[in-house]
Amino acid sequence: MDTRLLDILVCPLCKGPLEHDKKKQELICKVDKLAYPIRDGIPIMWADQARDLQTPAAG
């Protein structure tokens, strides 16, 4: 993911900063506790596509 893009992207809900999780290919909003997926190098910034970080992973 291009670092210049990361500098301008914000959470669509709170407008806060995002952190890039390279391993999981996600953009993380720590305020809303959501992880937005990155698919084929494109961040998917729809709230309904975000993973809730407060929900335990199935396993």
From Swiss-Prot:
InterPro entries associated with the record: Trm112-like
Any GO CC annotation of this UniProt entry: cytosol
Top-level division of the source organism's lineage: Bacteria
Transmembrane domains' residue ranges: none
Family: Belongs to the UPF0434 family.
Entry-linked PANTHER family: PROTEIN PREY, MITOCHONDRIAL, ZGC:162634
HAMAP family for the chain: UPF0434
Protein name: UPF0434 protein HEAR2489
Organism taxonomic ancestry: Bacteria, Pseudomonadati, Pseudomonadota, Betaproteobacteria, Burkholderiales
